[in-house]
UniProtKB/Swiss-Prot annotation:
It is an enzyme of class 3 (hydrolase). One of its GO terms (cellular component) is cytoplasm. Single strand-specific metallo-endoribonuclease involved in late-stage 70S ribosome quality control and in maturation of the 3' terminus of the 16S rRNA. The gene is ybeY. This is Endoribonuclease YbeY. PANTHER family: ENDORIBONUCLEASE YBEY, CHLOROPLASTIC (PTHR46986:SF1). InterPro entries: MetalPrtase_cat_dom_sf_prd, YbeY, YbeY_CS. Zn(2+) binds at residues 124, 128, 134.
Amino acid sequence: MSFVPPATEVLIVADCWQAESEAEAVVLRAIEAAAAMVDAETADAELAVMLSDDAGVRTLNANWRGLDKPTNVLSFPALQPSATMPDDAPRMLGDIAIAYETTRREADDEGKPFDHHLSHLAVHGFLHLVGYDHETESEAEAMEQLERRILAQLGVPDPYADQDRADQDRVN
């Protein structure tokens, strides 16, 4: 059976994203690349990506995580399907929210092209939807390695390279 990516709806809910005409295409490519690389059944699956602003993501972060501040990306994995759902109903993976101002600021601060950082955040958010996490050091290492491999497929340089160099400098 050939690979079928999840149906992905990108919702642009903040006007600030109008400055990034390719944002939707960047997100869709990143999600498809991530889905192709992970061992998760994505045929007949759906997810939504909300391109928001800091205010919208701050509200979500406060309501769902108790953190009254914006962040770059939030993921909300869907609950497992219930036995009462029809067999042919699409399987909802969940939702991802990305904050424009934080994403822009981080990309600028790190000297990265905006679309590279957006790709990274979309991949990161998707991996959370399919069960990856970074609560422990080993989980973080596994997730970061997978992110690197997916992003390399998209032609995006290692987003952790500078962090790894800084960690190495502290050790030496």
